[in-house]
Amino acid sequence: MSARKFVVGGNWKCNGTLASIETLTKGVAASVDAELAKKVEVIVGVPFIYIPKVQQILAGEANGANILVSAENAWTKSGAYTGEVHVGMLVDCQVPYVILGHSERRQIFHESNEQVAEKVKVAIDAGLKVIACIGETEAQRIANQTEEVVAAQLKAINNAISKEAWKNIILAYEPVWAIGTGKTATPDQAQEVHQYIRKWMTENISKEVAEATRIQYGGSVNPANCNELAKKADIDGFLVGGASLDAAKFKTIINSVSEKF
């Protein structure tokens, strides 16, 4: 059994209403009792405007303390940046985590490796923990560039932060071609890339950091495939999109931690 604690994150993206978010939050909280929380860390990525509501609901739920809240993005500076949310604002609102570098931020909003790395640095310096997303597009995979792309993304982050800062990072490997498409990397494909990530970290950071850093898999994770993925040695959890909007499906994915014991 790995010493790395299994971690399952739900990324709610730009979804929900006040009513649906309340139902979902209560459902997730009910799924994670104290015993399960010892085995798996559960994080929910919440749209900015619903974060206070989710925090309020969790505070009133018996198992609410077992669920950690994450923002889905953040900006590096305060000031004249209309529409942005600064990392310090998240800290001020007692949000412990932030998801950075998600493929949708990279693809739709054209965030570069260097911009993502700067966000990671500033977030950690502010006191946040980061889920840092990396992964290749379908064209890059077909061109056999997966390792090259992932290495460049890792290098940018590593160049921006200290070795000690890695303890505040969870990596999420998300093959872009598998996100929201219904396609999923096979367990062997996912393990192969996770193993490469750990090898890169061993060679470029340290063996200790490589062994301690948790690497989630993200990309159409669902109740049907989570158990087989969880069996793989270098898969330390999941970053879940669509299935995390259904409390019952998310519960099944959280419980895939049983494959690690």
Swiss-Prot record:
Gene Ontology molecular function: any one: triose-phosphate isomerase activity
EC number annotated for this UniProt entry: 5.3.1.1
InterPro entries: Aldolase_TIM, TIM_sf, TrioseP_Isoase_bac/euk, Triosephosphate_isomerase, Triosephosphate_isomerase_AS
Keywords: Gluconeogenesis, Glycolysis, Isomerase
Active site residues per record: H102, E174
Key word Isomerase present: yes
Ligand binding (D-glyceraldehyde 3-phosphate): N11, K13, G180, L239, G241
The keyword Zinc is annotated on this UniProt entry: no
Catalytic activity: D-glyceraldehyde 3-phosphate = dihydroxyacetone phosphate
GO cellular component terms, semicolon-separated: cytosol
Class of this enzyme: isomerase
Disulphide-bridged cysteine pairs: none
Any one of the GO BP annotations: glyceraldehyde-3-phosphate biosynthetic process
Pathway(s) this gene product operates in, as recorded in its UniProt entry: Carbohydrate biosynthesis; gluconeogenesis; Carbohydrate degradation; glycolysis; D-glyceraldehyde 3-phosphate from glycerone phosphate: step 1/1
PROSITE patterns: TIM_1 (PS00171), TIM_2 (PS51440)
UniProt subunit comment: Homodimer.
The protein's role, per its UniProt record: Catalyzes the interconversion of glyceraldehyde 3-phosphate and dihydroxyacetone phosphate in the glycolytic and gluconeogenic pathways.
Record family assignment: Belongs to the triosephosphate isomerase family.
Full protein name: Triosephosphate isomerase
Protein species of origin: Entamoeba histolytica (strain ATCC 30459 / HM-1:IMSS / ABRM)
Gene field: TPI
